[in-house]
A protein has these predicted regions:
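Amphipathic alpha-helical dimerization/coiled-coil segments
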Residues: 73-105
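Short, cationic-aromatic polyanion-contact patches
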Residues: 1-5, 20, 51-74
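Alpha-helical residues within the helix-turn-helix
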Residues: 26, 43-44
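Key DNA-contact positions within bacterial/archaeal DNA-binding proteins
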Residues: 22, 33
Length: 105
């Protein structure tokens, strides 16, 4: 399981707390099976808790909420992901500058 999928699902749960797994899968363009697998892992880690919609006729629907440790994990994953993307950006920028310099010779 990738940190990126975990971060994307944690972010989605923050942005759309009432979303079900199908909606998450559709919004993130990943398989329903992947969403189910990641959410189960997040629950096992204690980052997400599950509840029912108490004021809904759809008692079988679940609501996924980030726990305090889930919020902390989201912050850590976001920092890690930003650092990774920053390094990728710098590497691509250096590569582009090198190609441009070669083209000017």
């Amino acid at each position: 399981m990738s940190d990126e999928k975990e971060l994307n699902i944690l972010s989605h749960l923050t942005d759309k707390p009432g979303a079900n797994q199908r909606e998450i899968a559709a919004d993130l363009e990943i398989s329903l099976g992947s969403v189910n697998f990641v959410i189960k892992a997040l629950i096992e880690k204690g980052w997400v808790k599950v509840g029912n919609f108490s004021k809904s006729n759809e008692k079988h629907r679940y609501i996924y909420q980030l726990t305090p440790s889930g919020i902390a994990a989201k912050i850590t994953l976001t920092r890690h992901f930003m650092s990774l993307k920053q390094r990728e950006y710098q590497a691509l920028k250096a590569q582009l500058e090198k190609i441009e310099a070669q083209g000017q010779d």
